[in-house]
Regions:
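Sequence/structural signature of beta-propeller domains
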Residues: 1-303
Length: 303
């Protein structure tokens, strides 16, 4: 997983295990359909508390999805994961002859982590919201007996009427709800808390020219953070409120991540996975660039 080719694209808690989802679970060519990976919560807390100095050792969980990648036209891997008990939900991205597509699929994870097995017959398309390449539904929420998928780009010029799509736990479509305009990308989200709130990664890569904008309402209201370089990357966590009528921005400042500046040529880090950690803050993980990074971000003071 430390290699960038792991391309970790999602995080989710399964009980007391943090599950890391590679975009292509068979990236290491370990046979079969590959693996997802699990880190025990106790190991993560011990590492953060300084009582464990050794490296974190992920547990491979065999991934079973027979023939699924070959059935999806233009398959480009998995993008999001969430759990409801032992039921797993994942999104898939595809670049087809007719444009970008996203799909939802479900399966079961074994309590002993012996396998995560997808039911390939449940593959369900998520309607696209723009014609921009390499964009699909990259965040996934479980809200009671509903699943909520969130599209990657929701800025005013690229998606003027953003929506979140709803499904039941059998993946039957259950309508849509409104989603707020927000510039740049949404690449993952935490689970809902008891008040229906969640945080999401809001990221901008300067090479993503179709998402370039002169107007960023969040930055205009709250500022960009002291390490921002004009024209450079944006890395922030933004809080949202979910209810059955729609999703709205919470009126509070984003958490601005300290940017690496010229160390990465102003390009930033491609954060693709996000979970809360025991009231302490957040765990984030990068996709391919600049490498696989698992990071801890503390809760803002006063929370």
């Amino acid at each position: 997983l430390v290699r960038s080719r792991a391309e970790v694209s999602g995080l989710a808690w399964y009980g007391d295990y943090l599950i890391l989802l590679p975009q292509y679970p068979n990236f290491a060519h370990q046979g079969g359909d590959g693996a997802v990976y699990a880190l025990p919560r106790v190991d993560l807390l011990a590492w953060l508390d300084g009582s464990s100095a050794g490296p974190l050792e992920p547990i491979p969980v065999p991934f079973v999805a027979p023939g699924l990648a070959g059935r999806v036209d233009g398959y480009e891997g998995y993008e999001a994961i969430a759990f409801l008990g032992g039921q797993a939900f994942l999104t898939i991205e595809a670049d087809t002859r007719d444009g970008m597509r996203a799909y939802l699929v479900t399966g079961q994870i074994a309590p002993d982590l012996s396998a995560l097995t997808l039911d390939t017959a449940t593959l369900t398309e998520i309607p696209p919201q723009s014609e921009i390449d390499n964009k699909s539904d990259e965040a996934l929420l479980v809200a009671g007996d509903r699943l909520v998928t969130i599209y990657e780009v929701n800025g005013a010029s690229v998606n003027p009427a953003p929506l979140a799509h709803l499904f039941d736990t059998g993946l039957a479509p259950a309508g849509t709800i409104s989603f707020p305009q927000i510039e740049y990308r949404i690449t993952d989200a935490t689970a809902l808390d008891g008040e229906g709130r969640f945080w999401a990664i809001n990221y901008y890569f300067p090479g993503d020219t179709k998402l370039r904008t002169e107007s960023d309402p969040l930055a205009e209201r709250y500022g960009r953070g002291p390490t921002y370089i004009p024209g450079g990357a944006v890395e922030r966590l933004v809080e949202f409120q979910y209810d059955e009528s729609g999703i709205a921005l919470v009126d509070r400042p984003p958490i601005q991540l300290e940017l690496p500046g010229e160390a990465l040529g102003g390009l930033g880090r491609n954060w693709e996975g996000l979970v809360r950690l025991d009231g302490r803050g957040f765990l984030l993980v990068t996709d391919e660039f600049p490498d696989t990074i698992l990071a801890f971000v503390p809760e803002p003071e006063g929370e």
